[in-house]
A protein has these predicted regions:
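Terminal amphipathic alpha-helical/low-complexity segments used for targeting or macromolecular assembly
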Residues: 1-104
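Structural signal for interior beta-strand "rungs" in well-ordered beta-sheet cores
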Residues: 100, 104-145
């Protein structure tokens, strides 16, 4: 069964999707989130001059919210309560080398959720980048966007 079919079948029965869902669905959703994270797939893109929404990608993101429980994360200045798979964000645990390899600048107070893509030479001023976002190369997301 294709990735698209797995997601569409799960979507039709989304009221049954939970943290107890089978591993094949979890693996499929996680693969899509990983692919979003590296820019391999996009929720929407311009094809032949027209914007196209890839519904199965959008559905996979929405299913992920049903699949993962809420968790608490305590930091030195605050605490957060969010879905477990998104809590720590895209750059959690990154070294200086990881940031240099990614090639984008993010100033403090610019959380970037896992499952979002940020291109090289992008600049993130204080902003919030949600799962599914695609920030192309050289783009600036300005303060509080």
């Amino acid at each position: 069964m294709s990735i698209e079919n797995i997601i569409n079948d799960a979507w039709e029965n989304r009221d049954q999707v939970s943290p107890n869902s089978d591993e094949s669905l979890k693996n499929t959703v996680n693969q899509i989130i990983d692919d979003l994270d590296i820019g391999k797939v996009r929720v929407a893109e311009k094809i032949n001059g027209e914007w196209v929404t890839h519904q199965h990608i959008k559905k996979a993101i929405m299913l992920s919210f049903r699949m993962y429980p809420m968790e608490n994360l305590n930091g030195p200045y605050s605490s957060w309560y969010d879905k477990a798979h998104l809590l720590k964000g895209k750059t959690a645990g990154w070294s200086k080398e990881d940031h240099e390899k990614a090639g984008f600048r993010m100033v403090p107070n610019s959380p970037v959720r896992k499952g979002s893509f940020v291109g090289k030479n992008a600049v993130l001023m204080p902003c919030y980048v949600n799962i599914g976002a695609y920030i192309d190369e050289g783009t600036m997301i300005d303060t509080f966007a």
